[in-house]
Amino acid sequence: MKDYKTTLNLPKTNFSMKGNLSKKEPFILKKWNDNNIYSLIKKQNIGKKKFFLNDGPPYANGNIHIGHAINKILKDIVIKFKTLSGFDTYYTPSWDCHGLPIEHKVEKTIKKENILITKKEFRIKCRNYAQSQVNNQKLEFIRLGVFGDWENSYLTMNFKNEANIARTLMKMFKYGYVYQDFKPVHWCINCKSALAEAEVEYHNKLSNSIIIKFKLAHNINFWNQIFKNDHNQDIHLVVWTTTPWTLPASQAIALNPNFKYQLIQTNNNLFIISEKSVPDTMNKMGIQKWKKIHIFLGKNISNLKVIHPFLNTTIPVILADHVTQELGTGIVHTAPEFGQDDYYACKKNNINFTPTIDKKGHFLNNIHPKLNNINIFKSIKIVIKLLNNNNALLHSEKLVHSYPYCWRHKTPIISRATQQWFININHNNLRNRCIKYIQEVKWIPHWSKNRMIEMIINRPDWCISRQRTWGVPIPIFIHRKTGKLHPDTIKLSQKIIQNIETNGIQAWFDITEKSFLGELFKQYKKVTDVIDVWFESGSIQLSNIYNKIQHQHNNISDLYIEGLDQHRGWFMSSLIISAAISNQTPYKKVITHGFVVDKNKKKMSKSIGNTVHPSEVINTLGSDILRLWTASTNYSKEMSISQETLIHISDYYRRIRNTARFLLANLHEFNPENDLINAKNMIILDKWAIGKALHIQKKIIKSYKNYNFHDVIKYLMNFCSLDMGTFYLEIIKDRQYTTQKNSIARRSCQTAMYLILTAFVKWITPILPFTSDELWEYIPGTNKNKFVFLELWSNQLFDLNHKDTMNHEYWNQLLIIKTEVNKALEHARQNKIIRKSLEAHMTLYVNETIKCNLKLLNKELKFLFITSKVEIKNFYEAPKDAFQSETITNFKTIIKKMNGIKCPRCWHIITKIKNNKNHEICKRCILNTIGPGELRQFL
């Protein structure tokens, strides 16, 4: 028998079946770098509508983690799809380069090297370390396939940027937003510095929960106020606290003016407790019987004092609205040094205080002999012992509760009153204006808007000063005695900032008061605090690089994309600064993505060992797999990743790659400049496929525009698996392989595949840039850009005429019918009736509507089902053993094995072959090899 393989148009391509992404991607990266791909894109898009994506700067510290990777990938997907949509996109990668993470790394190095250095030398080491981390992280981000202006990245430590940050701060001073005060702020005793709201995270903590008593001093006053007599029996106020270490700083005892309080008697004791709290408190104290003596409102007592249980002091009883009775006794001790509520309550009552601890969290030496230089958390046992020795401890137990922790050290923090600089959130109606601007922004997901509003409503004034070395300074002079600003502060700062722009932040620290102020140095001193890094990052929007290119945007970025934690962080700081200085929002849209968790929805942790490192995924599976996982996951929720997940995603990738490969392989020897078929001459199925691709493209572009990337993947997978894989590509194999090379039948098919492929490669480009770049090089034709990233969405796809009989609705019905036929064929295979569908002689028993639709295909119907013979009969003629469709009511199938001979060329079973020395193939194959060629109209 003759080998007919050479007479077939078999698929052929060098585009490999396996991606081998981890090996190929570095070569593709080099090609992009050699061609300066970002500059090429920028150059081509000059004059187009601009799109700005502002980059929330990560810390220049350590290797990137999976959260970093997700964030950069999401941003890159946006930039790439916006470029395909005809925008001139701007993306400048940014880094936070100052702050504690860098300081701690340098401090460890210094300690290890056992050397002493000056603060100036320390800053140099911090700068060098930060730069090295930027260099490393930049390579890691680029390895993800992220495009951006890497050569002009925004580093907060660049001299011009340091100057701009200081300049932005001085505008806040100028407009009256900044003030100095001595009040409690979040304080980390390990950082030895104040913390911003965004630097605090909450964890469950096991604490000592104690109930103690404070004896009324001169309790005759109480008896006179309540009972109008001068009875003198001892009375104790019962107080509950979970921070025993704050008791040495107690300056008052607070009751709520609106609560009812009971004076109760137990044996020989008289206690005052809130009425609601009595049963629970008595139960904890192990007291089963007590007598209610009197009930009174908190506001009905005044001018009372209590004796501190272990300090030789008396402190006043005050009224405060912040006192609650959900937990505890409805009475709290008040330490203004260690809490905002306590601070304001004491301030309202003109109660002054002095510090009891130092910046390291150690008690000062004048508080109590037992507490000298003791760490506050280690002092708890000592305090409880002092209470016990003084018969003041009524109950002690352990309690698990939510407690603030330092996000860097993962250790408990405190509120500590220190002299700090603050931004007044209520000045010039700033808080309400921020709320107004939030409502003008498009928030994705929508619930994040209310979250931001709630945070703005409840947030305190912003503490912007830090007691550290490596950071942008607060470049001002204050009076040595009064603390007031130098009268020429704004003018002086301009000169200082100009110096910083030339020489960096060290320029400020090199300045002496005498050299800069002359004789006034005796009256004024320079501030040595540095600015909160969140203020630094929040100032990016007002930086020079954005001022130059965003003039037509009024310095409003089109989009911010960051993790959930940035509501308190960068989203917040950017908003406050922009609202205060520019009277507008800094962003038009804000996307919040969730945190990464493992397959069990647990937060990733090195100690648990459930982390997934981007480098491991990239080195084994490739960046495109990580990008595909990112896009396929609903980022508005927690994003679960595991090895099992990545295996599943790899299956997605194979489906996408194999679809592209099939299309490409069947474009062998196809030249679009010469071989494209005019739409009016095309086979109807091919026109349907192009129309289907157009419908999918519209859905994909809409999903990109709505930032629903997981929907893009859903549409891609359905298109590859259903529309192409089990329908179109299966049906056209016979026509593509067996018809004549240059026939209308084949060129029509190739035209469809070419148009679909050139659209398809662009659909995947934002998500799979490495694969799309590789694929683009294999797509035939010279009338295209060198890189797919320079292209726009396809405009060559066209639709079927909805007025035609064989419109999309018609083909949708055929898709449903073919699905049911495939089930019947599979049933026949399982029952050993046939091995392959071409062995089938199929009879369909259908209603009149389906019969009419199928008969439109005439003799080509068998190609729809990939069988050798199809007959159509009335549904009522169906035998009892016919295969019944579960989806279509009036649809049954009988499948028998086709009697006949298998054509060695097309593999169809035919009843008769003209067999002589010249012909051993079917009539159709004779037409396609030595005849004029087979004619097709529908399939």
Curated annotation (Swiss-Prot):
A motif ('KMSKS' region) lies at residues 603-607. ATP binds at residue 606. GO terms for cellular component: cytosol. Gene3D superfamilies: 1.10.730.20, HUPs (3.40.50.620). Keywords: Aminoacyl-tRNA synthetase, ATP-binding, Cytoplasm, Ligase, Metal-binding, Nucleotide-binding, Protein biosynthesis, Zinc. It comes from the Bacteria. Its cofactor is Zn(2+). IleRS has two distinct active sites: one for aminoacylation and one for editing. The misactivated valine is translocated from the active site to the editing site, which sterically excludes the correctly activated isoleucine. The single editing site contains two valyl binding pockets, one specific for each substrate (Val-AMP or Val-tRNA(Ile)). Catalyzes the attachment of isoleucine to tRNA(Ile). As IleRS can inadvertently accommodate and process structurally similar amino acids such as valine, to avoid such errors it has two additional distinct tRNA(Ile)-dependent editing activities. One activity is designated as 'pretransfer' editing and involves the hydrolysis of activated Val-AMP. The other activity is designated 'posttransfer' editing and involves deacylation of mischarged Val-tRNA(Ile). PANTHER family: ISOLEUCINE--TRNA LIGASE, MITOCHONDRIAL (PTHR42765:SF1), SOLEUCYL-TRNA SYNTHETASE (PTHR42765). This is Isoleucine--tRNA ligase. It comes from Buchnera aphidicola subsp. Baizongia pistaciae (strain Bp). The lineage of its organism: Bacteria, Pseudomonadati, Pseudomonadota, Gammaproteobacteria, Enterobacterales.
